[in-house]
Amino acid sequence: VAWYETLAIGVKGGELYDAVMSRLGDPFFGIGLNPGHLIHLDEWLHSPIRKGSTMKLASGMALQCDVIPATGTDYFTTNIEDGVALADHATRKQFATQYPEAWSRIEARRKFIRDKLGIKLNPEVLTFSNLAAWLPPFWLSPGMAMVMSP
């Protein structure tokens, strides 16, 4: 939740890193990799989302939430791995005009994330997948999801 609610244009990568690690950085539920990165070829080459990063997130960035708790034990846990993009007001307006059907799906996903999952996304966060912020508590029960209490 902290990853999605902190994500915004102008946020420093280190701030996003700290938001996640302040909640999951303990010895048992530690994060095995960085908790987010750019997508495609940039996934393993460079990430603005790392400890101490001063790189600001910008409009046009396609990012992946990549929160994989690594217990270091025989116990496994569920994880969130999905992509979003950041778009400033002008880009969102242009996208909505050029691709109204896609825009309506993005808006429906954002509404679901807000109203059903209880996560407050910043307006510049565009969700392109139905998996965004969907966290099943058990691997074998993908139809269940964790939500924030009101």
Language model segments and positions:
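Active-site neighborhoods and metal-handling regions in enzymes and metal-associated proteins
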Residues: V1-P150
